[in-house]
UniProtKB/Swiss-Prot annotation:
Belongs to the bacterial ribosomal protein bS16 family. PANTHER family: 30S RIBOSOMAL PROTEIN S16, SMALL RIBOSOMAL SUBUNIT PROTEIN BS16M. GO terms for molecular function: structural constituent of ribosome. It holds the Pfam family Ribosomal_S16. The keyword Ribonucleoprotein applies. The gene is rpsP. GO terms for biological process: translation. This is Small ribosomal subunit protein bS16. It comes from Cytophaga hutchinsonii (strain ATCC 33406 / DSM 1761 / CIP 103989 / NBRC 15051 / NCIMB 9469 / D465). One of its GO terms (cellular component) is small ribosomal subunit.
Amino acid sequence: MAVRIRLSKRGRRKLALYDIVVSDSRSPRDGKFIQKLGTYNPNTNPATVVLNDELTFDWVMKGALPTDTARTILSERGVMLKKHLQVGVDKGAITQEVADQKFSAWVSNKEASKTSNANALVSKKEADRKARLAAEVKIKEAKAEQVRAKKIVAENPVAAADLAEATDAPAEAAE
């Protein structure tokens, strides 16, 4: 029996959630499965993956083949690297201690990368918010200046003529 690790769709249209499952390759996408390994939510930024890594690793070592999307998710979580290292240990190319050391180094590097990416995303959002706020303040100041000029014109026609000359003078100097 050919066993696949794949995504099983659930949720609703335009807001799909996926279960990461082990199933027979001949069964339909949302049909019967052997075991549920976790969930995948692509609607969040970054995508949320809840996965039982040890159980998934056991299935991969037993010969379950992941689909392309499932392989990407498993690679992101380190299951495929762990399999690669374990195959090296089984063949005698490296020792278990070296494999564990390489895997833990990869995990720490991955965590640092995730943290820096999350911080960059937060700082970008903050910078965008500040830029929008500054643009809004400029627009409000311009509107307030227009309202003030209209009040002056309505209250005192002589001052309005002086105001018109004051605004025309900088325009003429610029030309």
